[in-house]
Amino acid sequence: MKGLKRSRGNAMALAGAMVIAFSIAGCAPDTPVTATGEDPGQGTGGGPVTPDVSDQEVLDARRAAGIDECPTTDASGPVVEEGPAVEGGLPDLTLDCLGGDSTVRLASLRGPLIINVWAQWCGPCRAEAPYLAEFADTHPEVQMLGIDYADPRPGAAVAFADEADWDWPQLSDPDRSIAGPLKVVGPPHTVFVDADGRIVHVHAGPFTSTEQLEDLAAEHL
């Protein structure tokens, strides 16, 4: 993997300081924390989302960054099963893969799976990013899936995922369609899904260490 792996110690120390600095539980979309210093623009407050680049440019950037293709019945990554939604499972919603080259039906996903809802404009998301990357590095038995949420800049989102060393599949939800079904107040918001497709735990707000994420995965998955 790329990026943070080459300077993981410094990144982890910086992440710890950032988590302390961001003492809020997460980023409410109406009042986003902008770690880049840029105005996140429309979309984070419920208005229409105007992407910063075309789908093709996002797709090209995603593939250049080595981010995995989104899951299908024939692909590696989270297990997909055709059939009805599972009671207590993910909502029966279909989201685009970041880049628009495919779609994923959430209700078809099976675990063990961790779904992390994030946005490139969200400061706490950036703070927890190294912990997610380290967990994914050391726990290949747990599948990872991201959802870029309420984000008007998918191009910047791909750049963030690349810098964060996130190579797992990423979906896109610019219109916040998962907000109600998954009770997302704002990112980061993380959902744990078991092998039967049931939601077994939800963590609202940023992780403060890799160990915290490991403990939750061991307890619930």
Task: Identify the role of each PLM range.
Residues G3-A15:
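Bacterial N-terminal signal peptides that target proteins for export
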Residues A28-T31, G123:
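Bacterial signal peptide processing site
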Residues F22-G26:
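C-terminal motif of bacterial Sec signal peptides marking the signal peptidase cleavage site
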Residues R126-A164, P174-G180:
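Structural microenvironment flanking redox-active thiols in thiol-disulfide oxidoreductases
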Residues T103-R126, L132, M144:
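Short active-site neighborhood of thiol/selenol oxidoreductases, capturing the structured segment around
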Residues A159-W166, D173-L221:
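Thiol/disulfide oxidoreductase modules built on the thioredoxin-like
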Residues A35-D92:
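N-proximal helix/coil linker or "cap" segments that precede and/or mark the start of modular domains
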Residues P84-E87, D92-L113:
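A short beta-strand-turn-helix
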